Swiss-Prot record:
Cofactor binding notes: Binds 1 zinc ion per subunit.
Listed name of the protein: Alpha-mannosidase 2x
One Pfam family it belongs to: Glyco_hydro_38N
Quaternary structure (record): Homodimer; disulfide-linked. Interacts with MGAT4D.
Role played: Catalyzes the first committed step in the biosynthesis of complex N-glycans. It controls conversion of high mannose to complex N-glycans; the final hydrolytic step in the N-glycan maturation pathway.
Cytoplasmic-side positions: 1-5
Membrane topology annotation: Single-pass type II membrane protein
Gene3D superfamilies assigned: Glycoside hydrolase 38, N terminal domain, Glycoside hydrolase family 38, central domain, Golgi alpha-mannosidase II, Golgi alpha-mannosidase II, domain 4
Coiled coil: 43-74
Gene assigned in the entry: Man2a2
Highest taxon above the source species: Eukaryota
Length: 1152
């Protein structure tokens, strides 16, 4: 009844507009001054104009009448079938394009002004060191520095330590890559297990010995294979401080390409394992090998309750500058932080590497002589041709003096008289002889030094935390507090160069196929975690937990660990040997399939009308998977739904916490299909043929695209029936432009295709928000015009190719060393274009030799319709030392500034620096990059991590793939020749600035920037598409299904449910508690936010968790540290929580 009223009102409104238009026109003619001058006689031209306009009005009235009739017919049919929400009804407008009537519902809830204050900033003190400013001010001149080639000569007076002894901590460590030259398992078998076995026996020989370990993935594998006796010994070594687990993540993650979901997840997995098995809680971070450092990591470590951290791979010029200004140790603060709550103490290692020659002091020739693995007769030696000597009574005085000189020089670079000296390298201490050589010789040196009061030195073995504790004690502060006089720093340490102009910016793109697969696995893991947690909570509440497959928890655990393993700094980076990449790929695919099973099992339980009838049968799953991959390096193939006389059902999962209106595309085997909602209403669908190439249709496969409104984190149900063409089945129209290429185009009688041989002029596709223009010759995007603006905005896509240098040093897996600026991509033959238009989406597909591009525009209200969906299927397997790039040219006046995200967590402003080579101006882009001026912002959202830059005014440029034939001398020993056909997916969002132009807050704008709410949602729409799960065909009647609405009320727009993750009782079974991890996003209110189709608002960071989940009670709630090791407050009866902008908060939660 309510729907009838709405339609009647809508139709009446259209009729009124038409009549009023006619009245105005007649009125204008009546008051025409020319008419009065002519004594009331109409000129013939006026009469013909009036006649034309009356005819147009009659046509419009007729169209409106037709629309209203169709709506009435639809309403009658709908109300005859069922009650429920109205369907979207598209119609043709006078100019032949499609339009969709707006839904009779609020399209936007306003944002509270208080929630806009955060992005304006201006609070708190500015840090002394802002990395953007440091980079602008540094000359990057690479002056020869003597024995410390990238530094300077260091001098001291022997009296410098008369008042306070130099305290030296030598920290033995072994850096174990979970895959690089060898696979994870091969490293474990051949090296890592021997390191850890020797550690247990060798540390127990002398309580003064210490050892540092970081990678829990290896440690957990070893733990599973050792005796109870050895486990007890390990616990004792941890308890007495001889063995320290630093950071405690599953791996030492890459900080450029990894998404913050995965960074948090691998940290939780490691910390939970340590707590459960060792009772250990990490205190200090240790990141010696990631290729550049993100400011997201110090935030995560601080929120996990770590107090200190160490980093190593920072641009050599920055290291030199910080060494000269005694700034190598600092409080690292987040850019938005106004009260120092995010501060963490950070130590930056000053020299070239973390190996022994570069850690005792500035002279590697001397330091190498104190790496006792290199004693004569061993397998490795010192490149400086002076070998180590075993320490004896006869030489200890000379050798100790030589080493002390290095210690003293190194200590002059720091503000305290406490010195850190790491002692280790990759896979060190794998043989008992090395343990003996290092520990015996160093102990003799320490004993000698410590026996001489005149040296004013105390040297000993130590752990990283012992070093930090001694520093805090010396400076008179509590652990983690800011020592007096130490600087505060904000910003990040990208991009990294280790020497000359060798910038490690290639790995931002290397092996993009696996960077994409990583994010697919991540989205599936989050979706599976949430659905499993909800299904288990409902099953337990209903007393049905015994029937539910709790064993799925083992699959979740394995997937967590697979995703964690792939965050390793030689995995997601694309910098491992080919065989190791295959091993990672096989693991990723296995976990992806497992997660689809977990999702299917949870969705099955949650959509059943009668859950008492649920039974788990692994042999015959209730739901099919949405897609499948024939191998780890193949693109997915979507499941085709076979229609016959009986209805088929489809369950659609929305992994977003917000309700979404999206076009869901299904593949079916018949063009004659009717789609019904859960309530039995027919839904309008756009039907298209399915193409296998530019001109070939796939026989008997059709794409059905239906707009569906899905509940947040919920499950929708659709019914498919075979049907003759009805009013709800709307065909796409297709044009193919051959551009003179001799090709035959597939044809089907049911789907006419218009073929244009040549001479195509520019053309456009459009929706309610914009008109998008393309070149008729190239098929590439040219411009965008918003419907409410006269002016077109330049938005030109160009493909480019980079070569590599002809000199000895060439690009490889790590390095980007281009031979010159990029050259335009020149195709061997003109492209074939295919334009598809229909009621719910229109798209332009362009086929070139090395890529094919599909740019799609959704004709929907809200988030989906406000950006361009772009995908590029890239195949450069015939390239030799070339890289393919996409450049976007705009008329935005960006003035050399652009913005890239760090780990999908925060935005970092960047400045194009002309003094640096081209490759230095590239940065990681895991999620988005944007340019802006005082009027507009253009954001490129990405579904996979790639390298990005802005090399010219108004430009954004992204490297899509790279094929390189040689090693770049960083240890890998291979080029990048295993390229795959890769699909890179993007969203292009153009926004208009409505308030607060960047100049108003210029200082603040330099150091911080935030996406809009629309941009945040667009990013999530791209990275978490709906999952389409067909109900498997079975004998007999299908059980009744219902949609699943888990949230009783919408989450605030700026809240992101990062994860709802069951905690382990053990590796294979869940506990009763789960971890709820929420992130409140910072956003810029100054970009247009009217009628954008959000069904949410903001709430000043407040959320009532107790009433959030429909049908479930929160029976226990406790705020904890990020990884749940530390309770932050007692469990409370109140379930109301509050988050500050940008903060991630974790809660121990019990649902029942």
């Amino acid at each position: 009844m309510k729907l009838k009223k709405q339609v009647t009102v809508c139709g009446a409104a259209i009729f009124c507009v038409a009549v009023f238009s006619l009245y105005l026109m007649l009125d204008r003619v009546q008051h025409d001054p020319a008419r009065h001058q002519n004594g009331g006689n109409f000129p013939r031209s006026q009469i013909s104009v009036l006649q034309n306009r009356i005819e147009q009005l009659e046509q419009l009235l007729e169209e409106n009448h037709d629309i209203i009739s169709r709506i009435k017919d639809s309403v009658l049919e709908l109300t005859a079938n069922a009650e429920g929400p109205p369907a979207l009804l598209p119609y043709h407008t006078a100019n032949g394009s499609w339009a969709v009537l707006p839904e009779p519902r609020p399209s936007f809830f306003s944002v509270s002004p208080q929630d806009c204050q955060f992005a304006l900033g201006g609070r708190g003190q500015k840090p002394e060191l802002q990395m953007l400013t440091v980079s602008e001010d540094l000359p990057f001149d690479n002056v020869e520095g003597g024995v410390w080639r990238q530094g300077f000569d260091i001098s001291y007076s022997p009296n410098d330590w008369d008042t306070e002894d130099l305290q030296v901590f030598v920290v033995p460590h072994s850096h174990n890559d979970p895959g690089w030259i060898k696979t994870f398992d091969k490293y474990y078998t051949e090296q890592t297990q021997h390191i850890l076995n020797s550690m247990v026996s060798k540390l127990q020989e002398d309580p003064r010995r210490r050892f540092l370990w970081a990678e829990v993935s290896f440690f957990a594998k070893w733990w599973d294979n050792i005796s109870a006796q050895k486990r007890a010994a390990v616990r004792r070594l941890v308890g007495n401080g001889q063995l320290e687990i630093a950071t405690g993540g599953w791996v030492m993650p890459d900080e450029a390409n990894s998404h913050y979901f995965a960074l948090v997840d691998q940290l939780i997995e490691g910390h939970q394992w340590l707590e459960r098995n060792l009772g250990a809680t990490p205190r200090s971070g240790w990141a010696v090998d990631p290729f550049g450092h993100s400011s997201t990591m110090p935030y995560l470590l601080r929120r996990a309750n770590l107090t200190s951290m160490l980093i190593q791979r920072v641009h050599y010029a920055i290291k030199k500058h910080f060494a000269a200004t005694h700034s190598l140790e600092f409080m690292w603060r987040q850019m938005w932080d106004s009260d120092s709550s995010t501060d963490i103490f950070c130590h930056m290692m000053p020299f070239y590497s973390y190996d022994v020659p570069h850690t005792c002091g500035p002279d590697p020739k001397i330091c190498c002589q104190f790496d006792f693995k290199r004693l004569p007769g061993g397998r490795i030696n010192c490149p400086w041709k002076v070998p180590p000597r075993a320490i004896t009574e006869a030489n200890v005085a000379d050798r100790a003096a030589l080493l002390l000189d290095q210690y003293r020089k190194k200590s002059r670079l720091f503000r305290s008289n406490v010195l850190l000296v790491p002692l280790g390298d990759d896979f060190r201490y794998d043989k008992p002889q090395e343990w003996d050589a290092q520990f015996f010789n160093y102990q003799r040196l320490f004993d000698f030094l410590n026996s001489k009061p005149e040296f004013h030195v105390q040297a000993q073995f130590g752990t990283l935390s012992e070093y930090f504790d001694a520093l805090y004690k010396r400076t008179g502060v509590e652990p983690g507090a800011r020592p007096p006089g130490f600087p505060v720093l904000s910003g990040d340490f990208f991009s990294y160069a280790d020497r000359e102009d060798h910038y490690w910016t290639g790995y931002y793109t290397s092996r993009p196929f696996y960077k994409s697969l990583d994010r697919v696995l991540e989205a599936h893991l989050r979706g599976a975690e949430i659905l499993y947690s909800l299904a288990l909570a409902h099953a337990r509440r209903s007393g049905l937990a015994g029937q539910y497959p709790l064993s799925d928890f083992a699959l979740l655990t394995e997937a967590r660990r697979t995703l964690g393993l792939f965050q390793h700094h030689d995995a997601i980076t694309g910098t491992a040997k080919e065989a190791v990449v295959v091993d990672y790929g096989v693991r990723l695919l296995r976990s992806l399939v497992s997660l689809k099973q977990v999702i299917i099992n949870a969705a099955h339980y949650l959509v059943l009308g009668d859950q008492e009838t649920y039974s788990f049968d692994p042999g015959t799953p209730f739901l099919q998977m949405d897609d499948s991959r024939v191998s780890h390096d193949a693109l997915p193939e979507r499941t085709v739904i076979r229609l016959d006389s009986s209805p088929r059902f489809v369950v659609v999962f929305n992994p977003l916490e917000q309700e979404r209106l999206s076009v869901v595309s299904l593949l079916v085997n018949s063009p004659r299909v009717r789609v019904l909602s859960e309530e039995g209403q027919p839904l309008s669908v756009q039907i298209s043929v399915h193409w296998s190439s530019a001109t070939d249709m796939v026989p008997d496969v059709y794409q059905v695209s239906v707009p569906v409104r899905l509940p947040g984190l919920g499950l929708g149900v659709l019914q498919l029936q075979p049907d003759l063409d009805g009013p709800y089945t709307l065909q796409s129209s297709v044009r193919v432009y051959l551009n003179g290429v001799k090709l035959s185009v597939s044809r089907q009688s049911a789907f006419p295709v218009r073929v244009v041989d040549s001479g195509a002029s520019d053309f456009a596709i459009s929706n309610r928000y914009m008109q998008v223009w393309f070149s008729g010759l190239t098929g590439l995007l040219k411009s965008i015009r918003r419907v409410d603006e006269e002016q077109e905005q330049q938005m030109e896509l160009e493909f480019l190719v980079y070569g590599t240098r002809t000199s000895k040093d060439k690009s490889g897996a790590y390095l980007f060393l281009p031979d010159s600026e990029a050259k335009p991509y020149v195709p061997k033959k003109p492209p074939v274009l295919r334009v598809t238009e229909g009621p719910f989406f229109s798209e332009v597909a362009v086929y070139y030799e090395h890529f094919h591009q599909v740019i799609r525009l959704y004709n929907l209200p809200g988030v989906e319709g406000l950006s361009l969906d772009m995908s590029f299927q890239v195949d450069i397997r015939d390239y030799v030392n070339k890289e393919l790039a996409l450049r976007i040219h705009t008329d935005i006046d960006s003035q050399g500034t652009f913005f890239t995200d760090l780990n999908g967590f925060q935005i970092q402003p960047r400045q194009y620096l002309k003094k640096l080579p081209l490759q230095a101006n590239f940065y990681p882009m895991p999620v988005m990059a944007y340019i802006q001026d005082s009027q507009r912002r253009l954001t490129l959202h990405t579904a996979q991590a790639l390298g990005v830059s802005s090399l010219g005014n108004g430009q954004l440029e992204v490297i899509l793939d790279r094929r390189l034939m040689q090693d770049d001398n960083r240890g890998l020993g291979q080029g990048l020749k295993d390229n795959k056909i890769t699909c890179n997916r993007f969203r292009l969002l153009l926004e208009r600035r409505t308030t607060m132009s960047p100049e108003v807050h210029q200082e603040q704008e330099r150091s911080t920037s935030y996406p809009s709410l629309l941009s945040h949602l667009t990013s999530m729409y791209l990275s978490t598409p709906p999952l389409v799960l067909p109900v498997a065909k079975r004998q007999g009647t299908s059980p009744a299904l219902r949609s699943f609405h888990p949230l009783a009320s919408p989450l605030p727009c700026d809240f992101h449910l990062l994860n709802l993750r069951m905690l382990p009782a053990e590796d294979t079974l869940p506990a009763t508690d789960s971890a709820l991890i929420l992130h409140r996003k910072g956003f810029d209110c100054g970009l247009e936010a009217k009628n954008l189709g959000f069904n949410c608002t903001t709430s000043q960071g407040k959320l009532a968790l107790g009433s959030l989940f429909h049908g479930l009670d929160v029976t226990f709630l406790q705020p904890t540290s990020l990884t749940l090791l530390y309770p932050l407050a007692s469990p409370s009866n109140s379930t109301d929580i509050s988050l500050e902008p940008m903060e991630i908060s974790t809660f121990r939660l019990r649902l029942g």
